[in-house]
Amino acid sequence: MGRRAWTLQCTAFSLFCAWCAMNSVKAKKQFVNEWAAEIPGGPEAASAIAQELGYDLLGQIGSLENHYLFKHRNHPRRSRRSALHITKRLSDDDRVIWAEQQYEKERSKRSVLRDSALDLFNDPMWNQQWYLQDTRMTATLPKLDLHVIPVWQKGITGKGVVITVLDDGLEWNHTDIYANYDPEASYDFNDNDHDPFPRYDLINENKHGTRCAGEIAMQANNHKCGVGVAYNSKVGGIRMLDGIVTDAIEASLIGFNPGHVDIYSASWGPNDDGKTVEGPGRLAQKAFEYGVKQGRQGKGSIFVWASGNGGRQGDNCDCDGYTDSIYTISINSASQQGLSPWYAEKCSSTLATSYSSGDYTDQRITSADLHNDCTETHTGTSASAPLAAGIFALALEANPNLTWRDMQHLVVWTSEYDPLANNPGWKKNGAGLMVNSRFGFGLLNAKALVDLADPSTWSSVPEKKECVVKDNDFEPRALKANGEVIIEIPTRACEGQENAIKSLEHVQFEATIEYSRRGDLHVTLTSAAGTSTVLLAERERDTSPNGFKNWDFMSVHTWGENPIGTWTLRIADMSGRIQNEGRIVTWKLILHGTSSQPEHMKQPRVYTSYNTVQNDRRGVEKVVDSGEEQPTQEGLDENAQASQSPSGSGVGGRRDELAEGAPSEAMLRLLQSAFSKNSPSKQSPKKPPSAKPNIPYENFYEALERLNKPSQLKDSEDSLYNDYVDGFYNTKPYKHRDDRLLQALVDLLREEN
């Protein structure tokens, strides 16, 4: 073939490709039933053309004079082909200078294009922070994040906000914390100096504060550990748990530098042993009051408190006066499974929930650790409270003028019910808010909270009012085992007075109760709107004869309700211990709220699906308040229904279903691992575990049954087995709680072999 012929062929092929490409581009266009035209004659001429040619005149195009938009009366709304004949007829009109059929144009927002969440940061443990990004690898897991990333993408990262962690010290020279360390938010109350550095020991006992601070303020993009929720905030440490704690010390740390510190995060409290009743002393209480009145230049300090880890001990955080305070935001935990973890306590004062550790195989929380190290094993409500504090720091950066009560309202109004809806105990109160004794108003949603706090739209809540309701003629009433005292409390909520209340916030029932066995008491309060709240559930380990002395039982479950009407209080003992006796000596009902409805509550709260992908696991029927345990699943056997027993050995002040057939292979591997601990030959890493150890299935299930039988636990101070669960959780596949419980199960199996 000659050079000329080859050149002609190449040219022809190129022209053909160009023609194909041009037609391909045209084919991709979506033409719409709209024509733009330039008509110098103005609106009268445009109207005449429309009438003559079969168009509807849609009007002038923006501010362009003599440019009009038309819609043809007999043409489809969208088409892949242009209507050239219609365009030609319009453009051929002498009154039209130019005409063109409109088509869809693809446009992209010119924001910074972001990689996947996994690639946002170079910190090595970022991809393990499952609670900040949806990293689930299993379809059965619910959506797992606190919606923090959308807030960061707005440029809100905690700048200008100061948080102090009240704990056992802070390793402030840690390379993932140092850049955000604030010495003005720090003090050592154990050694009375300005250096909160923790005391090192062989077991790293004082790691707690550093871990909590890291969750809040770990530096981003520094190739170290992970990323803090408010990674540009300033963080300080108060060292106070590594020594003697007094009321004076607590008052000093709660009121430390309130003009500088915005948020105080505390992951500790009285002993979570299921038998302690204790709250702030006189001085600490005054420090709380001073903080909310004078802190942050009068806007009020934000106090965040972990709700407690006494679940296994059958504890109830209504007996903890720190989480039960109207001045604190009490935060509970949810596991990676979206369930209430084994250590979580139930009470009517919990405001909201954050993520933390759960069952033995669940992921835990990532943070900084002692000796400039990192950890992925931070646990308990200790880990939940700092996450909440970080989210509140984001809100304060967005709106520094938020008051302490604004923050509580924001939490109530934006926390999510949907991701935790698989759990029992949810109820809708008289104001239309979903609430639960385990989770408060639900899982924190950082984006929703920050969006609502936008200073351009947020209206600060009205002035706080307090109305006290009591019966001056009340005579002490006797209570015995299997008995109940019912008190009807009619109230007009101080109507007509300066302190009248029409919209509730906190409700306190202050009482003095003398009783021979305090832990057998059950207290329920029903509001005028019909919301029933358990103020105190039974605590099997609480054998104290001391009762309650002017104790404030606090509830947030009636938030937003109108209190006018008759309230009903029930105090009962259904233990069957016939020797029990006592009396209700005094009581008063304290209503906290506002005389007018807050602006954001004038429209009802609308709940939307948090996780549309993972709704197939839903199916929880409506149940009564979680404190009034009622099984919600069919087919519960007697042992499962009865499994609410006392718990085991006390813990410190820090707030660190049987399927049919064979046990799961994962369960058997865990058991085999535990069996191997006492045999050196089986500990060799070179010998992989067999798929299924030789454990008779009937023994396996018998051991599980024994773990859940109340008869094995009654009056036992040293029990390790109590899961503090109701019938609902007993129908779930059994999950190991920790190494001690695993070993206990193994020991039971060995007894039979």
Swiss-Prot record:
A Gene Ontology biological process in which this protein takes part is:
peptide hormone processing
Q: Provide the primary localization.
A: cytoplasm
**According to its record, what are the GO cellular component terms?**
extracellular space; membrane; neuron projection; transport vesicle
Q: Which family does it belong to?
A: Belongs to the peptidase S8 family. Furin subfamily.
Signal: present as a keyword of the record?
yes
Q: What does this protein do?
A: Involved in the processing of hormone and other protein precursors at sites comprised of pairs of basic amino acid residues. Substrates include POMC, renin, enkephalin, dynorphin, somatostatin, insulin and AGRP.
Q: What is this protein called?
A: Neuroendocrine convertase 1
Which residues are catalytic?
D167, H208, S382
Keyword set for this entry? Calcium, Cleavage on pair of basic residues, Cytoplasmic vesicle, Disulfide bond, Glycoprotein, Hydrolase, Protease, Serine protease, Signal, Zymogen
Cell location: Cytoplasmic vesicle, Secretory vesicle
Concerning InterPro entries, the annotation shows: Galactose-bd-like_sf (IPR008979), Kexin/furin (IPR034182), P_dom (IPR002884), Peptidase_S8/S53_dom (IPR000209), Peptidase_S8/S53_dom_sf (IPR036852), Peptidase_S8_Asp-AS (IPR023827), Peptidase_S8_His-AS (IPR022398), Peptidase_S8_Ser-AS (IPR023828)
What residues are glycosylation sites in this protein?
N173, N401
Propeptide-annotated positions?
28-110
- Required cofactor names: Ca(2+)
* Name of the gene: PCSK1
- Specify the P/Homo B domain's residue ranges: 460-597
Where in this chain does the record put each Peptidase S8 domain? 129-450
Query: What are the disulphide bonds in this sequence?
Result: C225-C374, C317-C347, C467-C494
